[in-house]
C-alpha cells in the first residue's frame, strides 16, 4: 500500500493499515448497544468499529474496500476543478481546488475528513480493508463542508481540531477491535506518512509558581501544583523557583501561563479562590 500526500499543508499526517480475511457481519450486542446509546445505528462490524472509535477517542476513521482502490495506492491531494464524487449518502458533488480529497490511482475515493465515496464503501462481499486515520487541517474541512453543504460527525470533529497522538492511538484501537471481534486478520502492512507540517515533537514549558499565584489571585502551594499537574499527565520537574513542564502529547490546547493556571485552579477548587476575592 502506497500513500502520497501532495497537499501536506492540508494533511499533516496520514496512516493507512491493511487488514485481510475480512468477514463482514453484524456487530456483537455490546457494540450495537453502545452505538445506539449515542444515537448511531449499527451498520456492520467493520463500519461500527470506525464509528465506535470516533465516539470513544474523538478521532474520525474511515474504512475503504481495498479491492475498489485502483493500484492499491492512496493519494491525498486537492481536487481538480470540475471533478465529481458521489458520497456514501448517494449525493453527487462537483469539486474544485479548495476541496481536499482522498484518491486512488485515478479517482476520488473520499472527501477528506467529511465522508467516504460510494465507490469504495464496505459491502457484504468485502474481503480486504484499508483503515484510515489522519489529521486534516481544520480550516480545509470547514471550507469544504460549508461550500458543499455536506456535514458529518467526522467533519464536526475535524473542524475543532485533532492531534496526531490520538490519530496513532485510534488506529491501534481499531485494529485491536478487529482482532477482538474476529472479523479480520491484521497485517504488518502499514503506511504512516508524516509531512513537514506534522507536529509530533514533545512540547515543554517553564512556569513560575509565583506568576501562577498572581494570575489566580490566591496562593497555591507549589507541592499542590506539582501534584495536580502530575495527575493530569504533565511531566513536572522543579528547577529553582520554577517548574519545568512536559506537556501530554494529546494536549494541543496548552500554550501559555493562563492555560496552566486554569488546569491548576480547576483541580484545586474554584470555591477556594472565591474565598480570597
Model-derived segments and spans:
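RNA/tRNA-interacting regions in translation and RNA-turnover enzymes
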Residues: 1-274
Amino acid at each position: 500500500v502506497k500513500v502520497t500526500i501532495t497537499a501536506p499543508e492540508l494533511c499533516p499526517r496520514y496512516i493507512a493499515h491493511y487488514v485481510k480475511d475480512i468477514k463482514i457481519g453484524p456487530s456483537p450486542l455490546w457494540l450495537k448497544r453502545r452505538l445506539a446509546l449515542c444515537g448511531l445505528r449499527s451498520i456492520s462490524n467493520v463500519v461500527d468499529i470506525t464509528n465506535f472509535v470516533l465516539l470513544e477517542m474523538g478521532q474520525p476513521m474511515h474504512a475503504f474496500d481495498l479491492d475498489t482502490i485502483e493500484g492499491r495506492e492512496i493519494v491525498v491531494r486537492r481536487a481538480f476543478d470540475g471533478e465529481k464524487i458521489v458520497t456514501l449518502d448517494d449525493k453527487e458533488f462537483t469539486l474544485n481546488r479548495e476541496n481536499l480529497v482522498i484518491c486512488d490511482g485515478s479517482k476520488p475515493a473520499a472527501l477528506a475528513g467529511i465522508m467516504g465515496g460510494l465507490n469504495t464503501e464496505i459491502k457484504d462481499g468485502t474481503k480486504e480493508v484499508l483503515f484510515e486515520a489522519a489529521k486534516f487541517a481544520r480550516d480545509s474541512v470547514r471550507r469544504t463542508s460549508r461550500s458543499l453543504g455536506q456535514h458529518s460527525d467526522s467533519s464536526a470533529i475535524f473542524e475543532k481540531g485533532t492531534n496526531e497522538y490520538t490519530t496513532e492511538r485510534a488506529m491501534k484501537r481499531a485494529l485491536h477491535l478487529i482482532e477482538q471481534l474476529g472479523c479480520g486478520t491484521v497485517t504488518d502492512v502499514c503506511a504512516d506518512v508524516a509531512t513537514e507540517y506534522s507536529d509530533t515533537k514533545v512540547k515543554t514549558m517553564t512556569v513560575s509558581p509565583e506568576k501562577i499565584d498572581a494570575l489566580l489571585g490566591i496562593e497555591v502551594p507549589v507541592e499542590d501544583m506539582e501534584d495536580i499537574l502530575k495527575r493530569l499527565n504533565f511531566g513536572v520537574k522543579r528547577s529553582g523557583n520554577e517548574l519545568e513542564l512536559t506537556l501530554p502529547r494529546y494536549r494541543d490546547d496548552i500554550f501559555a501561563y493562563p492555560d496552566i493556571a486554569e488546569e491548576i485552579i480547576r483541580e484545586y477548587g474554584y470555591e477556594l479562590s472565591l474565598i480570597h476575592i
